[in-house]
Amino acid sequence: MQNIDLISEKEAKKLLEELADKIAMYNHAYYIEDNPLVSDSEYDQLFNLNLKLENTFPHLVLSNSPSKKIGAKITNKFAKVIHQAPMLSLSNAFDEEDIRDFLERIKNFLRINEFTPIFCEPKIDGLSFSAIYKHGLFITGATRGDGYVGEDITINIKTIKNFPHKIDNAPEFLEVRGEIYIEKQDFVNLNKEQEAQNRGKFANPRNAAAGSIRQLDVAITAQRPLKYFIYSGGVTEKNLASTQEQLLAKLKALSFSVNEISKLASSEEEIFAFYEYLKTNRHNLPYEIDGVVYKLNNFAMQNRMGFIARSPRFAIAHKFPAIIGQTKLLSITVQVGRTGMLTPVAELDPLEIGGVVVSRATLHNFQDIARKDVRIKDYVFLQRAGDVIPQITGVDISKRSNDTVKFDTPVFCPSCNSKLRYVSEDIIIRCDNGLNCPAQNYERICHFVSKNAMDIAGLGRKQVAFLIDKRLISNPLDIFFLKKKNETNLIRLENMDGWGKKSVANLWQNIEKSQKISLQRFIYALGIRHIGEQNAKLLAREFVSYNNFIAQMELLSKNDSDVYQKLNDLEGIGDKMLVDIIDFFYVKENIQLIKKLGAVLNIEDYKETREQNILTGKILVFTGSLKTISRVEAKEIAEKLGAKVASSVSSNTDLLIVGVNGGSKLKKAKELNIKIIDEAEWLAFIKCLEKEV
């Protein structure tokens, strides 16, 4: 974790941009692909770093900030369901101090001094879902999706044992929300079946549950041992209860499965006692839990507290610490990524941690190996927090033998044997051989065909590797001539191992379908280092059309100062991204490839869809005591209308809203000639804007 106090504004801006892209990628892998790329603890560290940066530099908060998003964008695999009320995530807490801060925030917001009852319940590690009933009949089930739009999994939910299709004495309209999960022993049995049928094993129970419920073939879902718990109500025609405790009792009476392990805490001590109880006994439970959820028990108080961008103020998740294990390090392999970055991966003597067999772990970077003095044949400590690839946290020196081998940091690329470049004090090592490096070329093609890029279904990593190995493709362009090439081959693709007439016919259809693509997705598909989906959208918005984009990039490759300045001035494109864009287009082969792709693709112009108002992007500051609403509520309203709220007045401030006793901020705003309005003017102003929105 970086020291926020020592970071400059320029560095903060770069870091926020990098975090937005990285967290978006991790969200997509976790929520959509059901395939986490990093540990829960590593993700939480990145997310918390993003929050701290935003709190320190509120005027730098990005429009695509992870703190404003829930889950990830949904795919086109299922029909879409718009949630009548957003399905929000919970903020995370990692120690008792975080929980004390949470309880203090409740008191301050509600302006109360006494402890108000908190409902405590286990945090199930599964897939969140919503179920809607009309006149007692189950009509719609949906995943969380991005929090606003989910995937329609109605038929799949109906296969879950004991899930009620019809309920008696229900209100005319009822929504319930819960978690779909697979018990630990069922998970072990399922993986044995997968192995016996020569199918891929699931990494953990959460992945198994998510992958099972999101099956297009409902017959597969029906065979899976899925279970569920309901933990809250969503939108309903009439109030079922006035507290969380009453609600769960009512839902149980309506025949829903609710978790019986819960506690209504009347003190801070009772909260922490319940947490310790569950932390100690979690391994005795038949299902995975990764923490405890605390909620204000009183619904009226919940409604008063409301929400921030992605989570409720009245609830929080107290996460458990990571599970620790120990095993032998057998070897270290080096992987080469799409952008040429090398990543060391530990190959381990398989070890079961928390019900999951672990055989690989991340070593983060080469400097980390040296710092921890990790050697081949060492016994290493592992940390796992519900993740696919755990982390190596240290070495058991007491078990070190004389035959351990120090790892030599590579000098040449393991894929193409070209000399490597060391970046950032040896933390990052890159191969600069680009498309001439087989590993980079493979990863680049995989990225090009991925769902958020060209979205060519039927071309997964395995299929891409096969086509490259058979010399049927060598770059992204070859994909669009594959059908023609196949027709002239002596042995056709449909007659090769792993393929058939139907899969090949579907592939041709999917390739043809992919040839119509938006400019922002095309730019993202190119795989430019540090240019994720949001930054690709920024570039598309700036250049609008493919023809203009490639013309401007060609000028950039010839050191055109106007194009350089245009990119340099583009809000959201940091210095590091600018260098990466320049490096990418300096390579003539890249421009040639893009031009050839442009000739075979129908690349649509960028179209702006976001609604804006006069406050969008403006920086506001509040000062003094507000009489009508609390400062927190005022900030929330401003942010909903697109403004950014800062804690101090600067030359970047657009508007100061003054309550009682404005103080030094008012004085400074007058000195800087910043527009100033009082609370009444502000309330009248936002009332007009909210009507427009």
Curated annotation (Swiss-Prot):
One GO MF term: DNA ligase (NAD+) activity
EC number(s) from the headed UniProt entry: 6.5.1.2
Annotated NAD(+) binding sites: D40, S41, E42, Y43, D44, S89, L90, E121, R144, E179, K295, K319
Keyword Metal-binding: yes
Residue ranges of every copy of the BRCT domain listed in the record: 610-693
Keywords in alphabetical order: DNA damage, DNA repair, DNA replication, Ligase, Magnesium, Manganese, Metal-binding, NAD, Zinc
Catalytic activity: NAD(+) + (deoxyribonucleotide)n-3'-hydroxyl + 5'-phospho-(deoxyribonucleotide)m = (deoxyribonucleotide)n+m + AMP + beta-nicotinamide D-nucleotide
The organism's place on the tree of life at top rank: Bacteria
Protein name: DNA ligase
Organism encoding this protein: Rickettsia typhi (strain ATCC VR-144 / Wilmington)
